[in-house]
Amino acid sequence: QDGRADVFAGNLGLNTRLQPSKEATIELWVADFEQRGIPSGIIVETINNTPYPFEQIQEISREFPSLVTSVESYSEYANASLNDLWPSWTNNQEQSQIQKKPLQTVMSKAWVSTETGYSEKELPVEIQSGPIRDWHIERLSKVDQGDQLEKVHILSIGNFAFWRPSLGAPQRANPMNHLIWNQQHESFELVAPSESGLILQGVFFNIHSISIKGSPHLLIGTHEGQSTLYKWN
């Protein structure tokens, strides 16, 4: 509302096993593990200074064939550390060749621009129930008892797609969330789907604002099937 650009960052959400904790760190390790001249990435969970592969064996079998052939059963893999699976990559010389990218958060975030910089604002916990793939901000004005009122609507779109078993069994998430910016309290307020009328099912990837006969509409793109069109009231 002040003309400064704010930042909204979608993320995986909290409805997943892929979360760092006090007991374990999670990193993406990138190196030429297979000695093919092509770097590959593997998600690593480190517990008590011991690195373990985070993903299940069937999820990484094509990317890391030597890792798969080094174990004889699923139970052996389940208890094996990377030290057991790739002994050559655990010495100091090989470790120096690995790029390690730590996972810090899977939460979606928002930063509001102020005169002195960006200020992170907490998003309602409901918005963290699933992945957010796109955002849309709409400023709508209406006259109420002679006063011109403007509300800033923030919409997020997403849901689970291309899910891997290692991430856990996700609970059902609302593919769309509708927030309103409360300027007085400088916070986001969640609008229930029953109140907003934005009730969706499925996996959605993007959202756009279009004008039809001078009226604002929302065009919502889905993973499969037909797109959805809503008219603002």
Per-segment meaning from a language model:
Residues Q1-N233:
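Beta-propeller-forming repeat regions
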